[in-house]
């Protein structure tokens, strides 16, 4: 493969995946808004005209259609399977010729899932979440560039480790209903998730900027790109929850 800087390698690997992940839900929302008036379907899904409390168009999914339920279930199962495959693949350090196709399929499925979630909740919150994501990402790039603080220090990594551990515990409690969460509890978890992965963006971007020449290889680029990918995906999911909770 061609000789490039580590940053260029990361961008080559990351940008297509993020484009797919964000492009699919944007397309789904725009297509659904058009289909609600034309009566057409999008990926087999049908929609009804509805409005939110602010009197903005809020496309409603037609839940009476059995295909809709099957679509949600099938996409959820496929997202789970390919997320596990992708995680195991990167943990084992598989080569790029296997990693890229698997991650591409994962990005496509995650994009469809996020699109379905945005349409299910309120696509207007999806737009707000997306704008917020770009603002956070822009700040996460600028801060390490112009700040003298080292975000890759052991203390900062330890703090992030504590945050992610707490987040995992809360998510397990939510998933298996070990503790009955109030609305405040759900909001706290969502904000903790958004803050944690925003800080992880800072950490991983600073890690990339501080990498030396010995780390300029495709294996390192693949790992850093994957970490940044996880940061962005998880951050968007928590932002969607925050805006959906209102």
Describe each model-derived feature in a short phrase:
Residues 1-246:
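A hydrophobic alpha-helical transmembrane-helix feature that marks the membrane cores
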């Amino acid at each position: 493969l061609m000789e490039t800087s580590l940053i260029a390698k990361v961008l080559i690997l990351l940008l297509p995946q993020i484009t797919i992940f964000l492009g699919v839900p944007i397309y789904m929302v725009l297509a659904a808004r058009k289909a609600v008036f034309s009566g057409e379907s999008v990926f087999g899904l049908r929609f009804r005209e509805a409005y939110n409390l602010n009197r903005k168009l809020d496309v409603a999914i037609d839940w009476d259609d059995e295909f809709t339920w099957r679509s949600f279930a099938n996409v959820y199962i496929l997202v789970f399977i390919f997320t596990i495959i992708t995680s195991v693949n990167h943990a084992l350090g598989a080569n790029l010729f296997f990693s890229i196709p698997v991650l591409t399929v994962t990005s496509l499925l995650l994009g469809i899932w996020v699109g379905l979630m945005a349409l299910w909740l309120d696509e207007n919150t999806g737009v707000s979440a997306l704008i917020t994501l770009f603002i956070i990402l822009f700040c996460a790039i600028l801060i390490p560039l112009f700040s003298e603080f080292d975000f890759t220090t052991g203390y900062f990594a330890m703090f992030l480790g504590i945050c992610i551990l707490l987040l995992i515990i809360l998510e397990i409690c939510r998933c298996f209903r070990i503790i009955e969460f109030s609305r405040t509890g759900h909001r706290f978890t969502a904000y903790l998730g958004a803050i944690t992965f925003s800080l992880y963006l800072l950490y991983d971007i600073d890690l990339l900027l501080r990498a030396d020449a010995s780390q300029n290889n495709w294996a390192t680029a693949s790992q850093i790109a994957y970490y940044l990918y996880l940061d962005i995906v998880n951050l968007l999911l928590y932002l969607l929850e925050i805006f959906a909770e209102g």
